[in-house]
Amino acid sequence: VKEFSEIKDSMHIDWDVPIKMDDGLELRADIFRPIKEGVYPVLITYGPYAKGLPFQQGYPSAWDRMAEKHPDVTRGSSNKYQNWEVVDPEKWVPDGYVCVRVDSRGCGASPGYIDHFSMRETMDFKECIEWAGVQLWSNGNVGINGVSYFGINQWQVASQQPSHLKAMCIWEGASDWYRDMTHHGGILSTFWANWFDMQVKTVQHGLGKNGMINQFNGRPICGNDELSEEQLEVNRCSFGDEIRAHPLNNQYHEERSAVWDKITVPFLSAGNWGGQGLHLRGNTEGFIRAASEQKWLEIHGLEHWTEFYTDYGVNLQKRFFDHFLKGIKNDWLDQPKVQLQVRHIDGFKKRHETEWPIERTTWTKMYMNDAYEMSGEIKNTDSSSITFDAMGDGIDFKSRPFDEETEITGPMALKLFVSSSTEDADLFVVLRLFSDQDNEVVFQGAVDPYTPIAQGWLRASHRKLDQQLSRPWRPYHSHTEKAVLNPGEIVEMDIEIWPTSIVIPKGYYLMLSIQGKDYECPDAQPQKLSNFKNQLKGCGPFLHNDPIDRDARFNGQTSLHFGESRAPYLLLPIIPKQ
């Protein structure tokens, strides 16, 4: 790969700049900076999606949907330099920022072995940050701003405390490799194996002209080298197999997760109510647990990538970075610590809070009974049970219609008393909203257009709690050992349900579905995005259908138990009207 520079579209662009790592390997970066000589703050990203692959070329269905619905995304830019889940330099360089995009080891223009989220990747990223901080065009203040992968690795690299890292914006970025990303409640997510096939192998370094060619400049996206399929395979991990080989939370997961007491840099953590199954939990946990004294939380809706690129998102990001990277005395320090786009059935309303979870929350228990109801009272005084197929559709508990508009915003928890005919059981928990006409109300999630209001998961053998980290509103499971069931034995299970926000109209009601498999919206009309294998039916690509992980042990009968001493309940965060 040859480095060269040009002045184009009102920017000085340095293509394929080498950055040498401590082991001698050279990563490649594209650098977009102001034409006027000077020193500027730097926004850097490091990731696998190929810096030379235009957003609209690599992800056409996501791009077309976003561009059509949100014209402010494309306005004011040629869009030739748009790249998946990182900033558009044409919207940042004119405001005095340098934008640096680094292809991670083994991807795009960078050679090497692909090992996602490993300590090697994290240390590469740290070295790139320190490199950017001392370049002639840098003022020494480096920030990170990106979505998803480019958010996840912010938590990781900040845990290593690079000296030039002065601020970061984690836009929809998970933080716990086990709990957020690979094993929901101990149940294997098949997302990463499919993601690896669709979004990484397609841009692996060494594809050369056999790979994609940038539609705007005609350059090979994956470098000039052309390796055989055997050589390509040697140069990458077997990602899905590696994840499956680590079913418990151990060093493999811990080195790919945030170290909260080491994260001290100012940050803005931006989550998505529809980010069930990947990112939302990481954004809220980061805000609660990171050691940083200057930290803010924002939660929005719509697709995973949309608000990052809209005027709403870009303006928020610029206010934050202008203060911390440029030293501008703007109004950022007056920004309330929490900014929520509170979700209604027909849109969102912005509201500020001072903390998360919201301090004025009325934590409300809704008890389930054997009449398939949810209410504020314990109705079962005698022992009883309901049994369902352990991999089936499960059972539904219905609340009474709400007699007034009611807001639920925050994390949730579910207590159950469970037995199985086998040694284990997987529980999939779905909180759903229905209209006064008995029609289910679903939302555009981070990926899926049929997303319910909240979900949670737990494998019975993973029910052990970390007592130090658990809270009534967020059970925290250790996942370091298995406690298998004796068939017929009744055990207590506390299930974490990821945060949500919904203002429930008068006359609408909630339904709690407890299932043995992933949720599917009954009214879903099959849809796909170009970068995912599966149809979108309610859970997006975040499925739990691996036949090795969910073998015959999970295919028996599951029973829920009721009684005065076994009163299952859903803990709801009801927000009083102000």
Question: What are these model-derived regions, one by one?
Answer:
Residues 4, 76, 313-315, 325-578:
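Glycine/threonine-rich phosphate-binding loop and adjacent beta-strand/alpha-helix elements that clamp
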Residues 52-56, 60-78, 82-89, 94, ...:
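Accessory cap/linker subdomain of secreted extracellular hydrolases
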Residues 83-84, 94, 116-136:
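Alpha/beta-hydrolase active-site loop
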Residues 89, 93-109:
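Conserved alpha/beta-hydrolase
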Residues 2-38, 42, 398, 402-404, ...:
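N-terminal cap/lid segment of alpha/beta-hydrolase-fold proteins
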Residues 269-271:
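Short beta-strand/loop motif that positions the catalytic acidic residue
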Residues 151-162, 416:
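Short glycine-enriched nucleophile-adjacent loop
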